[in-house]
UniProtKB/Swiss-Prot annotation:
Organism: Coxiella burnetii (strain CbuK_Q154)
Record EC number: 3.6.1.41
Pfam families the record matches: Metallophos
Top-level taxonomy: Bacteria, Pseudomonadati, Pseudomonadota, Gammaproteobacteria, Legionellales
Its job: Hydrolyzes diadenosine 5',5'''-P1,P4-tetraphosphate to yield ADP.
Protein name: Bis(5'-nucleosyl)-tetraphosphatase, symmetrical
GO molecular function: bis(5'-nucleosyl)-tetraphosphatase (symmetrical) activity
Protein family per UniProt: Belongs to the Ap4A hydrolase family.
Length: 291
Protein backbone atom coordinates (compact mmCIF):
# COMPACT_ATOMS: atom_id res chain seq x y z
CA UNK A 1 0.00 0.00 0.00
CA UNK A 2 2.37 2.70 -1.19
CA UNK A 3 1.81 6.40 -1.77
CA UNK A 4 1.21 5.91 -5.49
CA UNK A 5 -1.63 3.48 -4.79
CA UNK A 6 -3.32 5.98 -2.52
CA UNK A 7 -2.77 8.88 -4.91
CA UNK A 8 -4.38 6.90 -7.73
CA UNK A 9 -7.63 6.58 -5.79
CA UNK A 10 -10.33 9.17 -5.65
CA UNK A 11 -9.93 11.17 -2.44
CA UNK A 12 -12.41 9.91 0.11
CA UNK A 13 -14.71 11.94 2.30
CA UNK A 14 -13.35 10.93 5.70
CA UNK A 15 -15.58 13.15 7.79
CA UNK A 16 -17.23 9.98 9.08
CA UNK A 17 -14.55 7.27 8.80
CA UNK A 18 -15.33 3.62 9.36
CA UNK A 19 -12.36 3.27 11.70
CA UNK A 20 -9.67 5.56 13.04
CA UNK A 21 -6.31 3.90 13.65
CA UNK A 22 -3.56 5.64 15.61
CA UNK A 23 0.00 4.41 15.11
CA UNK A 24 2.88 4.66 17.59
CA UNK A 25 6.38 6.02 16.97
CA UNK A 26 7.26 5.00 13.40
CA UNK A 27 10.73 6.61 13.45
CA UNK A 28 11.52 5.88 9.83
CA UNK A 29 10.42 2.22 9.93
CA UNK A 30 8.52 2.34 6.64
CA UNK A 31 8.48 -1.42 6.02
CA UNK A 32 6.90 -2.12 9.40
CA UNK A 33 4.35 0.65 8.86
CA UNK A 34 3.21 -0.94 5.61
CA UNK A 35 3.02 -4.37 7.26
CA UNK A 36 0.92 -2.92 10.08
CA UNK A 37 -1.47 -1.32 7.59
CA UNK A 38 -1.83 -4.67 5.86
CA UNK A 39 -2.55 -6.34 9.20
CA UNK A 40 -5.34 -3.91 10.09
CA UNK A 41 -6.65 -4.04 6.50
CA UNK A 42 -6.46 -0.28 6.24
CA UNK A 43 -8.64 1.17 3.48
CA UNK A 44 -7.74 4.78 2.68
CA UNK A 45 -11.22 5.40 1.26
CA UNK A 46 -13.00 4.36 4.48
CA UNK A 47 -10.52 4.55 7.35
CA UNK A 48 -8.50 7.35 8.87
CA UNK A 49 -4.92 7.18 10.11
CA UNK A 50 -3.25 9.06 12.93
CA UNK A 51 0.27 9.17 14.34
CA UNK A 52 1.55 10.22 17.77
CA UNK A 53 4.76 11.80 16.51
CA UNK A 54 8.38 10.78 16.01
CA UNK A 55 7.63 9.93 12.43
CA UNK A 56 11.32 10.00 11.55
CA UNK A 57 14.87 9.15 12.68
CA UNK A 58 16.63 6.05 14.00
CA UNK A 59 14.89 3.77 11.47
CA UNK A 60 16.23 3.44 7.90
CA UNK A 61 13.46 4.98 5.76
CA UNK A 62 12.39 8.37 7.10
CA UNK A 63 12.06 9.85 3.61
CA UNK A 64 9.65 7.13 2.51
CA UNK A 65 7.61 7.56 5.69
CA UNK A 66 7.23 11.31 5.17
CA UNK A 67 6.26 10.99 1.52
CA UNK A 68 3.71 8.33 2.36
CA UNK A 69 2.11 10.30 5.18
CA UNK A 70 1.99 13.44 3.09
CA UNK A 71 0.05 11.50 0.45
CA UNK A 72 -2.71 10.50 2.86
CA UNK A 73 -6.07 12.22 2.97
CA UNK A 74 -6.34 14.26 6.21
CA UNK A 75 -4.09 12.18 8.49
CA UNK A 76 -4.19 12.94 12.21
CA UNK A 77 -0.56 13.77 12.92
CA UNK A 78 1.13 15.36 15.91
CA UNK A 79 4.79 16.27 16.07
CA UNK A 80 7.38 14.57 18.26
CA UNK A 81 10.83 15.66 19.35
CA UNK A 82 12.54 13.85 16.46
CA UNK A 83 10.28 15.61 13.96
CA UNK A 84 11.26 18.97 15.44
CA UNK A 85 14.90 17.91 15.24
CA UNK A 86 14.44 17.24 11.53
CA UNK A 87 13.01 20.72 11.05
CA UNK A 88 16.02 22.24 12.80
CA UNK A 89 18.46 20.24 10.66
CA UNK A 90 16.48 20.68 7.47
CA UNK A 91 16.45 24.45 7.70
CA UNK A 92 20.19 24.54 8.36
CA UNK A 93 19.89 25.76 11.95
CA UNK A 94 22.29 23.13 13.29
CA UNK A 95 25.24 21.31 11.68
CA UNK A 96 24.15 17.97 10.25
CA UNK A 97 26.85 16.15 12.22
CA UNK A 98 25.84 17.59 15.60
CA UNK A 99 24.20 14.31 16.62
CA UNK A 100 23.90 10.84 15.17
CA UNK A 101 20.81 10.48 13.00
CA UNK A 102 19.41 8.64 9.99
CA UNK A 103 17.90 11.68 8.26
CA UNK A 104 20.47 12.07 5.47
CA UNK A 105 18.08 10.95 2.72
CA UNK A 106 15.50 13.53 3.78
CA UNK A 107 18.11 16.29 3.98
CA UNK A 108 19.31 15.50 0.44
CA UNK A 109 15.89 14.90 -1.13
CA UNK A 110 14.74 17.13 -4.02
CA UNK A 111 11.41 17.62 -2.24
CA UNK A 112 13.01 18.39 1.14
CA UNK A 113 11.59 21.89 1.47
CA UNK A 114 8.12 20.72 0.49
CA UNK A 115 8.25 18.00 3.14
CA UNK A 116 9.53 20.40 5.79
CA UNK A 117 6.77 22.88 4.95
CA UNK A 118 4.16 20.16 5.34
CA UNK A 119 5.71 18.92 8.59
CA UNK A 120 5.87 22.27 10.34
CA UNK A 121 2.16 22.76 9.71
CA UNK A 122 1.38 19.69 11.84
CA UNK A 123 0.22 20.45 15.41
CA UNK A 124 1.49 19.23 18.78
CA UNK A 125 -1.98 18.12 19.92
CA UNK A 126 -5.03 16.77 18.11
CA UNK A 127 -8.39 16.66 19.86
CA UNK A 128 -10.89 14.34 18.22
CA UNK A 129 -14.20 15.32 19.78
CA UNK A 130 -16.23 12.59 18.08
CA UNK A 131 -13.98 9.93 19.63
CA UNK A 132 -13.30 11.75 22.92
CA UNK A 133 -9.58 11.38 22.33
CA UNK A 134 -6.48 13.56 22.48
CA UNK A 135 -3.33 12.70 20.53
CA UNK A 136 0.00 13.99 21.84
CA UNK A 137 3.56 12.74 21.52
CA UNK A 138 4.86 12.73 25.10
CA UNK A 139 1.93 13.65 27.33
CA UNK A 140 -0.04 16.38 29.08
CA UNK A 141 1.44 18.02 32.19
CA UNK A 142 -0.78 17.96 35.29
CA UNK A 143 -1.25 21.70 35.74
CA UNK A 144 -3.20 22.06 32.48
CA UNK A 145 -6.64 20.69 31.74
CA UNK A 146 -7.51 19.51 28.24
CA UNK A 147 -8.69 22.91 27.03
CA UNK A 148 -5.61 24.65 28.38
CA UNK A 149 -3.35 22.04 26.81
CA UNK A 150 -4.94 22.59 23.41
CA UNK A 151 -4.56 26.36 23.72
CA UNK A 152 -0.89 26.08 24.68
CA UNK A 153 -0.24 23.70 21.80
CA UNK A 154 -1.72 26.30 19.47
CA UNK A 155 0.97 28.73 20.65
CA UNK A 156 3.57 26.38 19.18
CA UNK A 157 1.60 25.93 15.96
CA UNK A 158 1.41 29.70 15.59
CA UNK A 159 5.18 29.96 16.01
CA UNK A 160 5.86 27.15 13.52
CA UNK A 161 3.53 28.55 10.87
CA UNK A 162 4.43 32.19 11.39
CA UNK A 163 7.03 34.38 9.67
CA UNK A 164 9.59 33.95 12.46
CA UNK A 165 9.58 30.13 12.55
CA UNK A 166 13.34 29.96 11.92
CA UNK A 167 14.12 32.02 15.02
CA UNK A 168 11.73 29.87 17.04
CA UNK A 169 13.36 26.62 15.88
CA UNK A 170 16.90 27.92 16.28
CA UNK A 171 16.34 28.57 19.99
CA UNK A 172 14.10 25.59 20.73
CA UNK A 173 16.57 23.11 22.23
CA UNK A 174 17.22 23.15 25.98
CA UNK A 175 15.86 21.83 29.28
CA UNK A 176 15.09 25.17 30.88
CA UNK A 177 12.75 26.41 32.08
CA UNK A 178 11.66 23.11 33.60
CA UNK A 179 8.94 24.68 35.75
CA UNK A 180 5.80 26.28 34.34
CA UNK A 181 4.82 29.78 35.37
CA UNK A 182 1.90 31.68 33.92
CA UNK A 183 4.05 34.75 33.39
CA UNK A 184 6.63 32.96 31.23
CA UNK A 185 7.15 34.86 28.00
CA UNK A 186 8.84 34.54 24.65
CA UNK A 187 11.13 31.64 23.86
CA UNK A 188 11.18 30.39 27.47
CA UNK A 189 7.42 29.98 27.41
CA UNK A 190 7.44 28.22 24.06
CA UNK A 191 10.33 25.95 25.05
CA UNK A 192 8.55 24.72 28.17
CA UNK A 193 5.34 24.05 26.24
CA UNK A 194 7.22 22.19 23.53
CA UNK A 195 9.22 20.11 26.01
CA UNK A 196 6.07 19.18 27.93
CA UNK A 197 4.26 17.92 24.85
CA UNK A 198 7.21 16.28 23.06
CA UNK A 199 9.83 15.25 25.67
CA UNK A 200 8.15 14.80 29.06
CA UNK A 201 8.13 11.48 30.89
CA UNK A 202 8.45 12.27 34.60
CA UNK A 203 7.18 15.40 36.33
CA UNK A 204 5.95 16.52 39.73
CA UNK A 205 2.41 17.50 40.70
CA UNK A 206 2.94 21.08 39.55
CA UNK A 207 4.42 20.20 36.18
CA UNK A 208 8.12 20.53 37.02
CA UNK A 209 9.75 18.44 34.29
CA UNK A 210 12.54 15.92 34.76
CA UNK A 211 13.92 15.64 31.23
CA UNK A 212 16.94 13.52 32.13
CA UNK A 213 15.29 10.27 33.26
CA UNK A 214 14.12 7.83 30.59
CA UNK A 215 13.59 4.55 32.41
CA UNK A 216 10.59 2.59 33.58
CA UNK A 217 7.90 4.05 35.80
CA UNK A 218 9.44 2.61 38.99
CA UNK A 219 12.70 4.42 38.25
CA UNK A 220 11.33 7.90 38.85
CA UNK A 221 13.52 10.32 40.83
CA UNK A 222 12.34 11.51 44.24
CA UNK A 223 9.04 13.46 44.13
CA UNK A 224 8.59 12.77 40.41
CA UNK A 225 6.09 10.39 38.82
CA UNK A 226 5.07 9.49 35.29
CA UNK A 227 2.98 12.38 34.02
CA UNK A 228 -0.13 10.22 33.57
CA UNK A 229 -0.22 9.27 37.26
CA UNK A 230 -0.91 12.90 38.16
CA UNK A 231 -3.90 13.31 35.87
CA UNK A 232 -7.56 12.92 36.84
CA UNK A 233 -9.36 10.68 34.30
CA UNK A 234 -12.80 11.85 35.46
CA UNK A 235 -11.82 15.47 34.97
CA UNK A 236 -10.14 14.87 31.62
CA UNK A 237 -13.05 12.77 30.34
CA UNK A 238 -11.06 11.78 27.24
CA UNK A 239 -8.67 9.07 26.12
CA UNK A 240 -5.09 10.35 25.93
CA UNK A 241 -3.11 8.56 23.22
CA UNK A 242 0.65 9.06 23.30
CA UNK A 243 4.03 7.66 22.29
CA UNK A 244 7.61 8.70 23.10
CA UNK A 245 8.27 6.37 26.05
CA UNK A 246 9.56 3.08 24.64
CA UNK A 247 10.45 1.77 28.11
CA UNK A 248 6.73 1.50 28.88
CA UNK A 249 6.41 -1.11 26.11
CA UNK A 250 2.90 0.13 25.37
CA UNK A 251 1.68 -0.15 28.96
CA UNK A 252 0.22 2.69 31.02
CA UNK A 253 -0.98 2.31 34.60
CA UNK A 254 -3.53 5.12 34.40
CA UNK A 255 -7.10 4.74 33.10
CA UNK A 256 -7.89 6.18 29.68
CA UNK A 257 -4.25 6.62 28.71
CA UNK A 258 -2.92 4.58 25.80
CA UNK A 259 0.84 4.23 25.32
CA UNK A 260 1.78 3.29 21.76
CA UNK A 261 5.59 3.48 21.60
CA UNK A 262 6.71 -0.15 21.58
CA UNK A 263 10.26 0.47 20.40
CA UNK A 264 10.14 -0.45 16.73
CA UNK A 265 13.27 1.58 15.99
CA UNK A 266 15.03 -0.33 18.79
CA UNK A 267 14.23 -3.71 17.27
CA UNK A 268 10.94 -4.50 19.02
CA UNK A 269 7.56 -3.80 17.39
CA UNK A 270 5.30 -1.16 15.85
CA UNK A 271 1.87 -0.81 17.44
CA UNK A 272 -1.42 0.79 16.48
CA UNK A 273 -4.83 1.10 18.12
CA UNK A 274 -8.37 1.31 16.78
CA UNK A 275 -9.72 4.37 18.59
CA UNK A 276 -13.30 3.15 18.45
CA UNK A 277 -12.82 -0.39 19.72
CA UNK A 278 -9.47 0.07 21.55
CA UNK A 279 -8.21 -3.08 19.83
CA UNK A 280 -4.44 -3.10 19.39
CA UNK A 281 -2.35 -4.39 16.52
CA UNK A 282 1.42 -4.95 16.34
CA UNK A 283 4.06 -6.14 13.91
CA UNK A 284 7.67 -7.04 14.79
CA UNK A 285 10.60 -4.92 13.71
CA UNK A 286 12.23 -6.06 10.47
CA UNK A 287 14.67 -3.16 10.06
CA UNK A 288 18.06 -3.12 11.73
CA UNK A 289 18.74 0.00 13.77
CA UNK A 290 20.94 2.29 11.70
CA UNK A 291 22.54 4.37 14.45
Amino acid sequence: MDARAINSREKADLKYPRNTYIIGDVQGCYRELQELLELIQFDSTKDRLGFVGDLVNRGPNSLEVLRFLKSLSSPLIVLGNHDLYLLILGYGLMPEDSYEHTLHAVLQAPDKLELLEWLRHCPLIRYEKSLSAVLVHAGLPPQWNIKESILHAEEISTALKGPHYLAFLKNLFGNEPSQWKEDLEGQDRLRYICNAFTRMRFCDAKGHLDLESEGKTNQAPSRFRPWFEWRNPQEDNVDIVFGHWAALNGQSSAPHTHALDTGCAWGYKLTGINLKTKERFSVPCQSALRM
